[in-house]
Amino acid sequence: MKINEFPPDIRTCILPEPSGEMYYRCIGCHKEFDIFRLLYTCPDCGSVLLLHSRNVANFDRLDGAMWRKIFDYRRMLNHKAIKGIFRFYEFIAPIIPLDQIVYLGEGHTPLVEANATLKKEVGLDFYFKNDGLNPSASFKDRGMACALSYINFVAGREKTGDLLAICASTGDTSASAALYAAYLGDFVKSAVLLPEGKVTPQQLSQPLGSGARVLEIPGVFDDCMKVVECLAENYHVALLNSKNSWRILGQESFSYEIAQDFDYEVENKAILVPIGNAGNITAVMSGFLKFFRAGLIDHLPKIVGVQSEHADPVYRYYMENDPDKRRFLPVSVRPSVAQAAMIGNPVSMPRVVELVQQYNRAAGKKSTFVVQVTEQEIMDAMIVANRNGNIACTQGGESFAGLKKAIQAGYIEPDDVGVLDSTAHVLKFSGFQEMYFKDSFDPDFEVNPRADLRNEPIRLRYQALSNCSSPGRPPTGKTFECLVGEIAEEIAKILDLKKK
């Protein structure tokens, strides 16, 4: 659809122009800082930052109904810059010119309704939001599109020259960072730090394929994170972990899309989000809050964070009901199938604490919850979900297991509708599925496959076939016909087929 075909009252708003001012605000001391510095923590108190906007064109002039109309019409516009997360440009980064936006096809991932079998199992309607269908096969692309668009903008404005983008990763962040940095070409190089032996082969192959320098170190993600934080503090590098506030902005698009897909009616919705470094749940809360304050939605959905008992610092923090008695303590992680969430000291924890308070205050009631699930529950849930037509990764299984726990705890009611964040594609974690089917988990995982969920190929062997067939010389004539009939007959028995 072309601009001149749009209603006159929104035509000038469809393709936005850069406007307003953006600034960092410290979560701790609330000081503000200019965005044309690569800041990740407050220079004064050391706390993490969040990004804010002011004086954005049309922002205060337009009501919620008009914003909804603008975003719905932008769906029909064939313009690269606002096809992805920047459909919601004014709510993400309204200072970046459209020609500086990096778009690789991220965002607007499908909401897939659970089938009748799954609905019956849990007792309510729910959906999987398949963020594994992003370009690098995970939700990280939302934040990376924003962070690299910002770098692209600042590099051109400030003439910064060559830049090294760096991150620590459990696998998905490194794949996304390397992909988006590669798109920007020679002026941005990427390096990623991974915990040796704790990233799936599929995830490891991605940054290597994108040309990143991949550095593996002994330990876990939290150790890698400390190293990249040290590098960011002492060297000229761009940190691309969720400590980078631009990542949070891009990931807010997850909330905006859910609101739009439900026609902005989210009153009885419950969003299930796995928690690792806590950037994603930060973004989900922040996104819904922005839409609520701007009048695009009239209610705030419930937010349920989910953690494995093998990496559960946020769950432990909120186990204490008295806010005055809560004390955050990092935990030592144990092996987890939800590798992307295997983090014991999430850098966005201060953001979570701040936004949970804001969210519940705006909702007028407690609307944020955290549940804990076992490794067994995660794997069983992933296998069951995918046996019913989904592509859930282990973190998607974590969300599904969390839905059941939240229902048991009374956080989610029968008339609620669940939305489960499946953060990555199942193919990234196919090794865990194979371990489940073969019952080959290390005891530390504490996963014992259910017999009814295991599945392995049935190999058919025929001596006659091996005797008469060789490469390039398959059996022919009656020999071949006999073999086909013999094999077909055995398969029919295995599959319990009935004769015509």
Language-model-detected regions and their locations in the chain:
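Positively charged, low-complexity intrinsically disordered leader regions
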Residues: 81-157
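Short glycine/serine/threonine-rich phosphate/pyrophosphate-binding segments
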Residues: 141-147, 166-184, 200-202, 277-284, ...
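A short, small-residue-rich loop immediately preceding and capping a beta-strand
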Residues: 157-180, 187-195, 267-280, 303, ...
